[in-house]
């Protein structure tokens, strides 16, 4: 006889990078539970933070005034980390509310998050912190991250993020580390592996645009 292990379900909350205009708005239109989350968050961001998270997600304006200070990004302000992180937090809680509303939320599922997704996992399924606290926390986190890097008039910084796929390039982890270190020394520009996401398969890299460009050339 054979034994079949029970199916395991997991709810995984991602970090930044998947944000886009209109995300979550289909659920906003079709799910009362999701809409309630978005409207609760929007009321809080309007009153306490000086902007509308619904406006950010729906319209993705290239410029937004927050307490009289212009926030600018040529691809839309949803790509500024302080707004990205709030949008991701609200989206996560809205998705969970929609699942719960439909009776499809598994209380025995594994829950995890990556980077800002850790906060969202705690907020959406951990029953540890209320929505408003999560929104405030990730907004302040994003503001600090934003302030750490100089930006031009378009809201762009001189830094970029990339991904190394070592198994595609025939590299070991040590090879990848050495390559990144060598390029940083050659260019005199910051370049560093910041997350070893999947061993031997996916590493996140950040650095100045010139150094990222050299890394791309070496891997092609």
Say what each PLM segment does:
Residues 94, 116, 214-217:
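Generic structural signal for well-ordered, non-membrane alpha-helices
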Residues 114-122:
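Glycine-rich nucleophile elbow surrounding the catalytic serine of serine-hydrolase chemistry
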Residues 124-220:
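Alpha/beta catalytic cores of group-transfer enzymes, especially the acyltransferase/condensing modules
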Residues 37, 120, 141:
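Conserved short alpha-helix immediately C-terminal to the canonical SAM/SAH-binding motif I
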Residues 2-112, 205:
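Helix-rich "cap/lid" substructures immediately adjacent to catalytic or cofactor-binding pockets
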Residues 17-18, 118, 210:
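Gly/Ser/Thr-rich loops at beta-strand to alpha-helix junctions
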Residues 94, 122-124:
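Active-site signature of alpha/beta-hydrolase-fold catalytic machinery across serine-
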Residues 109-114, 136-139:
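Beta-strand segments within the central parallel beta-sheet cores of soluble alpha/beta enzyme folds
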């Amino acid at each position: 006889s054979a034994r079949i292990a029970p199916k395991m379900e997991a709810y995984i909350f991602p970090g930044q990078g998947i944000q886009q205009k209109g995300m979550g708005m289909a659920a906003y239109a079709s799910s009362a539970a999701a809409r309630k989350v978005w409207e609760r968050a929007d009321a809080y961001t309007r009153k306490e933070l000086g902007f509308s998270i619904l406006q950010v997600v729906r319209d993705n304006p290239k410029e937004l005034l927050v307490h009289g200070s212009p926030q600018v990004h040529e691809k839309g302000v949803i790509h500024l980390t302080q707004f990205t992180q709030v949008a991701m937090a609200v989206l996560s809680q809205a998705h969970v509310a929609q699942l719960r509303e439909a009776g499809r939320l598994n209380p025995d599922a594994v829950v995890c998050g990556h980077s800002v997704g850790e906060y969202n996992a705690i907020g959406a399924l951990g029953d540890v912190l209320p929505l408003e606290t999560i929104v405030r926390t990730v907004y302040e986190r994003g503001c600090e991250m934003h302030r750490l890097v100089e930006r031009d008039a378009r809201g762009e910084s001189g830094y970029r993020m990339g991904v190394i796929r070592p198994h595609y390039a025939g590299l070991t982890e040590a090879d990848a580390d050495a390559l990144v270190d060598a390029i940083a020394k050659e260019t005199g520009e910051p370049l560093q592996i910041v997350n070893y996401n999947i061993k031997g398969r996916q590493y996140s890299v950040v650095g100045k645009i010139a150094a990222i460009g050299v890394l791309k050339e070496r891997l092609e």
